[in-house]
Amino acid sequence: MTEDEAAVAALTEEARILFAGRIEFLKSAPALKFLPDPDVPEIAFAGRSNVGKSSLLNALTGRKSIARASVTPGRTQELNFFEVGEPTRLRLVDMPGYGFAKAPIKVAENWRRLVRDFLRGRVVLKRTLLLIDARHGMKPVDDEMMKMLDEAAVGYRVVLTKADKIKAEELAEVLARTQADARKHIAAHPQVLATSAETKLGIAELRAAVLADAGI
């Protein structure tokens, strides 16, 4: 085992232990004034409605219902905070889904304002994970979200969800296209991760990435 491989293995094991420990819902914030104190690093999760964000959060934390999927896409317009570790070492932030066709214009405007202000003003936000459905690839609304992240100067990783739903050769093509798209954005991390909440593909790697991005 090389030195780099040993470091990756150690980080992966540290992340496994951390996520096997205390993980608790802290609060929901419908506006910035309700945000928790900025005292620990935060990693945010963003993605289109029905991208599988709740399922991925549940798989990441090893819990069945730490994050509940909304019945109506676009219904949840709050930032949901989860504490990880005892004492708390980092927070996961479940951001409201975007691209919801059924949502009223006012709801969409409120979403943009809440998310934009959070991204621009949250000093402890270390990374945003942008979730993309592997079956569909990047959509125009995803590109809009990436531009918002670029403008806010928030570093982000692209994470493919539901990778088990397509064939291996299709996944390789989607990964290549997505990485090419990510390279066009100044704030995007060059590595794109492929995951599956069902088969747990990429979950250990995602935990390690979260730990590394949090800088703890």
What do the PLM-derived regions correspond to, one by one?
Residues 20-32, 165-216:
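Canonical P-loop GTPase G-domain recognition
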Residues 75, 90, 97-99, 135-138, ...:
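Conserved nucleotide-binding/hydrolysis micro-motifs of P-loop NTPases
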Residues 60-64, 119, 210:
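Hydrophobic aliphatic residues
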